[in-house]
């Protein structure tokens, strides 16, 4: 995310998802007085500078460094017909696990959580690691955790999550530069766990989650160049479930499925796919980070250590299927 520090405030430049979110929420709050924006000591996560907080008025609440209270507040507002949107950095969401489970998800209150910097390439000191949110959030019952790949998909998911009244919804905001899809995206995500096939091929299927969709595109291209394999590329969109219909379809003309996720492997998205195929002949390779605490790491070294470069992934694929 492109940001700079000015005094005690962060200034947000135009081309990042904080700015995209600010513009959307300011407009949405004017249109619908039920919408309330919440932060917990980090208003810059949503791009809410002092002038924007003043513009939002009573529809903006910063609770201070109290993520637990932020989630409980969002749950209570949602339970009473409001439309709360809570923005938080991935590294801080673990502080509110009790409230996510006991207050929000048990009651199935339709609050919205926007999780920023959920990525291996975010903050890199050991107390601010940003890649444990997928197993933490996605395994709580009733929660719907979404992983958009571009600006249009993100805004469509955000609009739907505020409009719907059935589930608590978290969105893993892309940890990339703002990317435009250049094509229409769905506006209704209520038919849960339906993945999107971005390119249909055969033999190898690449499930590239959220911010790692670009890595999936690179692997797709490199497989074609190196081995003339026209693979299938899938945008899962939903972190919290498996598209069993699509996964069953792949069995007909695929022998290998790989998953790519910008986070820790243990308890993550890829393991759901591996478990689904466990009793079949389909081979599965999961790519993500090892479960460990790392400190002041170099991102390129971390990616290489976890076989997360396109060259390494293609090498692994070809070693399995020739």
Predicted regions and their residues:
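Single conserved hydrophobic/aromatic residue that forms the stacking wall/gate
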Residues: 1-7, 12
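Short, basic, glycine/proline-bearing loop/turn elements
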Residues: 9, 55-61, 82-89, 120, ...
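Thiamine diphosphate
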Residues: 18-24, 30-55, 62, 68-71, ...
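A short, small-residue-rich loop immediately preceding and capping a beta-strand
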Residues: 36-38, 59, 80-91, 111-114, ...
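Extended, hydrophobic alpha-helical segments in both membrane/secreted and soluble proteins
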Residues: 60, 69-77, 82-87, 96, ...
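Hydrophobic/aromatic ligand-binding patch that stacks against planar heteroaromatic rings
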Residues: 73-77, 103, 136-137, 160, ...
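Conserved thiamine diphosphate
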Residues: 80-82, 107-111, 116-164, 316
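Active-site glycine- and acidic-residue-rich loops that bind
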Residues: 91-93, 148-155, 265-267
